[in-house]
UniProtKB/Swiss-Prot annotation:
The keyword GTP-binding does not apply. FAD binds at residues 12-45. This is Phytoene dehydrogenase. It comes from Streptomyces griseus. Transmembrane segments: none annotated. Its cofactor is FAD. Its EC number is 1.3.99.-. It is an enzyme of class 1 (oxidoreductase). Pathway: Carotenoid biosynthesis; lycopene biosynthesis.
C-alpha cells in the first residue's frame, strides 16, 4: 500500500463530517497530532442538525447500519462506543408499503423475517428468503475485507482468490436478476434491491455485488442513536477532542499552501495552520480545487440521483408508520428510467418516510412529532438545473404533500407546525457536485480501484476521504473511507475479520 512519505506528525483534517471524524480518531489512535477544521459551527457535515420550534431535526442520513465501524473508531482512542452513544436497534428495520395496499415489516432477525415473508407471500417465497439471506451473508464475507475495506493502488489487486469466490456467488451478474433467483415475488425483489437507487444504478443494471448494501440493511441491522443521528458525529467529535484533537469550528478553508509537491499549511478565513499532511473530506470538486488539480479520467464521472427532502414537525402522527417506511409506487422500473435517463421527476414516486419520534420522542416537544420524507429526484446533470429548481421546489413540495396525504398521511398539510425543504439548490450551495448528496454513482467503472482514488497524483501528502472516493456512498462506507485515509498516513493497522453488527436495545 502506498503511504504518505516524509514527516506525518501533525495532520489537518478538513471537514468534521463522519469521514473526517473517523479519520481523526484513527490518526489519534496512531499517535498523530490532529487538527480538524469545519466550516459549520457544529460537527456532522452532511449529518447536521436543525433546531426549530423545539424540534431537533437531523438534516442528513437517517439510516445507520454496521455500528461495529463506529465502535472501531472509538476503540482507536481506547474508548467504548456505549460510553458515548446509545444505539437502539430498530424492529422492524423498515416497513414496506406497496401500491396494491399490501405491506411487509422487514425484520433483520432471520426467523422473524422468514415468518413474515411466509405470511406475506407464501411458503415458497419464505424458503427463497432463507436461501437469499445465506447468499447475502456469504457475499458480505467475500467483499468486505478485500474489496470494500481496502486501499487500492492498482486494479491488479483484484487478482485474488476472493474475486473468483465473488464470481462464483454471481456477484458480476445483475442485481435484480440475482435477487429474483431466490424470490420471485416482485414486491420482495424491491425490498432487497431498492438500495441500488442511492448507489445511482437501477437494479436491472447494477452488479449483484451491490446486494452487500441489502445485507447491511436487512441482515446486519438498522439502528438509531438516542438523541438523533446528529448524536453520532457529536459523540465522535467529543471523543476526538478528549483524545487531544484540536477542533476549529466556523472556519472555511480558503487555500492550501504548498512547497513543491507537499502541502505545508491549511489556510482558513481566520488562521494559518502548518501541517505535515492533510485529509480532505469535501466533495471531490472542492477538494480538487483546493489541490489545484483534477485527475484525468478516460470518461467523465457520473453522479447518483439527488433527493428532495421535506422535514416536518407536526401536531399529530400516523401510527401505521414505522420508524422507517418505504412507500413504493407502482411504476417501479419507470422510476429509475426517469431518475437516471430522462431527467424527469418521478411520475409515481417511491418515498422513504422516517418518523424518528417513534423511537425517541424527546426530539420533539411533548405531543409533537417529526416526519422526514425523502423523494429521489434527478441530479442537475440530467434533470432540472439550479435555476429551474428555485421555481420548481415549492411546487414539488405541494405535489409531495398531496401524494403523502393520498397515501399514508391524510391531513399532513394541516398538521405541520415547522417545516424545511431541501432541494438540489441547497445541495449545490453546500458544494455537492451535480446537486446531489449521493456523490459519484457506483457504476462498474466507478467502483473499487476504478473509483476516484484517495491519493491525488502530484501531491504526496494529501489524502481524500468521504463518499466521492473509496469505498463509496453511505454511512458505513464513509466511516471506512476515513479509516482508509488515516491508513494512507499511518500505514495499515491490525487487520480485523469482517464482523456482523453487534446487538443493541430494540425499538
Amino acid at each position: 500500500m502506498i503511504t504518505v512519505k516524509g514527516p506525518v506528525d501533525h495532520v489537518v483534517v478538513v471537514g468534521a463530517g463522519l469521514a473526517g471524524l473517523a479519520a481523526a480518531l484513527h490518526l489519534l489512535g496512531a499517535g498523530r497530532r490532529v487538527t480538524v477544521v469545519e466550516r459549520e459551527d457544529v460537527p456532522g457535515g452532511r449529518a447536521g442538525l436543525l433546531e426549530s420550534g423545539g424540534f431537533r431535526i437531523d438534516t442528513g442520513p437517517t439510516v445507520l447500519t454496521m455500528p461495529d465501524l463506529v465502535e472501531d473508531a472509538f476503540a482507536a482512542v481506547g474508548e467504548r462506543m456505549a460510553d458515548r452513544l446509545e444505539l437502539i436497534r430498530l424492529a422492524p428495520a423498515y416497513r414496506a408499503r406497496f401500491a396494491d395496499g399490501s405491506q411487509l415489516d422487514v425484520h433483520t432477525d432471520g426467523a422473524a423475517m422468514e415468518a413474515a415473508v411466509e405470511e406475506f407471500a407464501g411458503a415458497r417465497q419464505a424458503v427463497g428468503y432463507r436461501r437469499l439471506r445465506i447468499w447475502l451473508e456469504r457475499l458480505y464475507r467475500v467483499q468486505m475485507r478485500r474489496f470494500i475495506d481496502t486501499n487500492f493502488d492498482s486494479p491488479l489487486q483484484l487478482a485474488h482468490p476472493d474475486l473468483a469466490r465473488l464470481a462464483a456467488l454471481g456477484g458480476f451478474g445483475r442485481l435484480d436478476a440475482r435477487i429474483g433467483h431466490f424470490v420471485s415475488d416482485e414486491r420482495l425483489r424491491r425490498v432487497f434491491s431498492f438500495q441500488a437507487l442511492y448507489a445511482g444504478v437501477p437494479p436491472a443494471r447494477a452488479l449483484a455485488a451491490y446486494a452487500v448494501i441489502a445485507y447491511m440493511d436487512t441482515v446486519a441491522g438498522v439502528y438509531f442513536p438516542r438523541g438523533g443521528m446528529h448524536a453520532l458525529p457529536r459523540a465522535m467529535a467529543d471523543a476526538a477532542s478528549d483524545a487531544g484533537a484540536v477542533l476549529r469550528y466556523g472556519q472555511r478553508v480558503t487555500r492550501l499552501e504548498r512547497s513543491g509537491d507537499r502541502v505545508t499549511a491549511v489556510v482558513t478565513d481566520q488562521e494559518h495552520i502548518p501541517c505535515d499532511a492533510v485529509v480532505l473530506t469535501p466533495d471531490l470538486p472542492v477538494s480538487y480545487r483546493l489541490l489545484g488539480r483534477t485527475p484525468h479520467r478516460p470518461l467523465p464521472l457520473r453522479h447518483s440521483p439527488s433527493a428532495v427532502i421535506l422535514h416536518t414537525g407536526t401536531d399529530r402522527t400516523w401510527p401505521d408508520l414505522a420508524h422507517h417506511t418505504i412507500s413504493f409506487g407502482a411504476a417501479w422500473k419507470n422510476t429509475f428510467h426517469e431518475l437516471t435517463r430522462t431527467g424527469r421527476l418521478m411520475s409515481d414516486p417511491s418515498l422513504l418516510i422516517t418518523r424518528p419520534t417513534a423511537t425517541d420522542p424527546s426530539l420533539a416537544p411533548p405531543g409533537k412529532h417529526l416526519h422526514y420524507v425523502l423523494a429521489p429526484c434527478p441530479n442537475t446533470e440530467v434533470g432540472p438545473g439550479v435555476r429551474e429548481w428555485r421555481e420548481l421546489g415549492p411546487r414539488y413540495r405541494d405535489e409531495l404533500l398531496a401524494e403523502l396525504e393520498r397515501r399514508e398521511m391524510p391531513g399532513l398539510g394541516a398538521a405541520i407546525e415547522e417545516e424545511g425543504l431541501v432541494t438540489p439548490v441547497d445541495w449545490t450551495a453546500q458544494g455537492h457536485a451535480a446537486g446531489t448528496p449521493f456523490s459519484v454513482a457506483h457504476t462498474f467503472p466507478q467502483t473499487g480501484p476504478f473509483r476516484p482514488r484517495n491519493l491525488v497524483r502530484g501531491t504526496v501528502n494529501a489524502v481524500l476521504a468521504g463518499c466521492g472516493t473509496t469505498p463509496g456512498v453511505g454511512v458505513p462506507t464513509v466511516l471506512i473511507s476515513g479509516k482508509l485515509a488515516a491508513e494512507r498516513i499511518t500505514g495499515p493497522r491490525i487487520a480485523r475479520a469482517p464482523r456482523s453488527a453487534p446487538g443493541g436495545s430494540s425499538a
